[in-house]
């Protein structure tokens, strides 16, 4: 079943953010764009490169009104230990949610049950809590925060411009499309 255009389910998890442990629920996402950035595990190999890339783009994400939630099935304590020991992870200013029971990961239908780990997946959620974009890659394939930014800008544009769609590789300021009978077969 596709989760596109479905509402995120209620959740309550502990997280590590800016040197503190905090509780995060679905209510924290209301009224704001959110990215749930699932990754398999702390202290691994591809994961820190991705999380560091998102950290490098975090200021721009914040300017777009986007909150980022990194999620793995590690505990919030493990997130703190990783944050304290890795120069790359120490750059992170967004919330790192611990999901040791896997409940949040299962809410997004993103659990590798045989391993108890999250798949490498990104979910873009609109201010109403509706999933607008999903990207899932194999464990050995890292994601690109630049493309995540592009997708968020496209999702925000489409949300504020009903009747328009963003074509492949669309970037902010470029032409969009207005689907109509006249356009059929002309692209």
UniProtKB/Swiss-Prot annotation:
Recorded GO CC terms: alkyl hydroperoxide reductase complex; cytoplasm; cytosol; membrane
Gene Ontology terms describing biological process: cell redox homeostasis; cellular response to sulfate starvation; hydrogen peroxide catabolic process; response to alkyl hydroperoxide; response to hydroperoxide; response to oxidative stress; siderophore biosynthetic process
Annotated localization: Cytoplasm
Induction pattern: Repressed by sulfate or cysteine.
Residue span(s) of domain Thioredoxin: 2-157
EC primary class: oxidoreductase
SUPFAM superfamilies noted in UniProt: Thioredoxin-like
Keyword terms: Acetylation, Antioxidant, Cytoplasm, Disulfide bond, Oxidoreductase, Peroxidase, Redox-active center
GO molecular-function terms, A-Z: hydroperoxide reductase activity; identical protein binding; NADH-dependent peroxiredoxin activity; oxidoreductase activity, acting on peroxide as acceptor; peroxidase activity; thioredoxin peroxidase activity
Positions of the catalytic residues: 47 (cysteine sulfenic acid (-soh) intermediate)
PTM-bearing positions, type N6-acetyllysine: 17, 93, 153, 169, 171
Reactions performed catalytically: a hydroperoxide + NADH + H(+) = an alcohol + NAD(+) + H2O
Mutant phenotype after disruption: Increased sensitivity to hydroxyurea, probably because more reactive oxygen species accumulate.
EC number(s) stated in the UniProt entry for this protein: 1.11.1.26
Assembly with partners or alone: Homodimer; disulfide-linked, upon oxidation. 5 homodimers assemble to form a ring-like decamer.
Functional note: Thiol-specific peroxidase that catalyzes the reduction of hydrogen peroxide and organic hydroperoxides to water and alcohols, respectively. Plays a role in cell protection against oxidative stress by detoxifying peroxides. Is the primary scavenger for endogenously generated hydrogen peroxides.
Other facts: The active site is a conserved redox-active cysteine residue, the peroxidatic cysteine (C(P)), which makes the nucleophilic attack on the peroxide substrate. The peroxide oxidizes the C(P)-SH to cysteine sulfenic acid (C(P)-SOH), which then reacts with another cysteine residue, the resolving cysteine (C(R)), to form a disulfide bridge. The disulfide is subsequently reduced by an appropriate electron donor to complete the catalytic cycle. In this typical 2-Cys peroxiredoxin, C(R) is provided by the other dimeric subunit to form an intersubunit disulfide.
UniProt record similarity statement: Belongs to the peroxiredoxin family. AhpC/Prx1 subfamily.
Protein name per its UniProtKB record: Alkyl hydroperoxide reductase C
Species: Escherichia coli (strain K12)
